[in-house]
């Protein structure tokens, strides 16, 4: 049976376009798999751009707006992109936020392992709720280099869920493209999990947790999800 690298029908993603899912699966089979197995001449950055281009296929056929056009597959530091993303609904917030009473323009720094601190703040009483600020564009290549270092270890036989969880967090915080970031990353992660004889996992709230937790907590939650997930959607 053909593997679906996108177990995405969950609380936050119920209306995924099937073409989008198909594009993701093809991008893994034709681009990422050859890269991961060292059968490609693409660099790490070229691989990301190529996979992104194949997924969007000149369109953003995702779940928020199936006809929303997006820019070419360029990193956000190569184009003029806003540096914040809203979390769409307050009820989707992770558990940790229940203990926070944010006020307008509160600024909190979260340490992400050994990379520059990631800053976010909340805006109360708005429809979009918490607003997350991405690292400045000047840090994008720095994060990509860290991602590549981790990926090289995975490609060279380090079958480590710790490294894989760290890769997810680096990628989520980097947010290299304007759109279609987490789908791309999780398709890679699910491909690797399948190679390691684990069941591919759903997105869940993992991206939110990457934004709001230090690395050790993110990896703990990722491991729990891998061990618990049975593929039942």
Predicted regions: what they are:
Residues 1-233:
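FIC/Doc superfamily catalytic core
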């Amino acid at each position: 049976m053909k593997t679906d690298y996108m177990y995405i029908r969950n609380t936050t993603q119920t209306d995924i376009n099937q073409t989008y899912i198909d594009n993701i699966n093809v991008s893994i089979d034709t681009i990422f798999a050859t890269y991961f197995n060292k059968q490609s001449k693409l660099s790490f950055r070229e691989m990301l751009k190529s996979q992104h281009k194949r997924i969007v296929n000149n369109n953003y056929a995702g779940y928020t707006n199936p006809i929303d056009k997006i820019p070419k597959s360029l990193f956000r530091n190569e184009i003029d992109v806003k540096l914040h993303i809203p979390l769409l609904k307050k009820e989707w917030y992770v558990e940790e936020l229940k203990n926070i009473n944010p006020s307008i323009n509160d600024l909190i720094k979260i340490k992400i392992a050994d990379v520059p601190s990631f800053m976010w703040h909340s805006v109360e009483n708005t429809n979009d709720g918490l607003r997350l600020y991405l690292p400045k564009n000047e840090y994008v290549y720095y994060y990509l280099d860290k991602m590549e270092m981790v990926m090289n270890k995975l490609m060279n036989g380090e079958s480590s869920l710790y490294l894989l969880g760290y890769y997810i967090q680096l990628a989520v915080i980097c947010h290299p493209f304007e759109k279609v970031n987490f789908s791309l990353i999780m398709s890679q992660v699910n491909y690797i999990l399948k190679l390691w004889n684990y069941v591919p996992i759903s997105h869940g709230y993992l991206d939110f947790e990457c934004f709001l937790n230090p690395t050790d907590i993110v990896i703990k939650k990722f491991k729990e999800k891998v061990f618990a997930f049975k593929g039942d959607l």
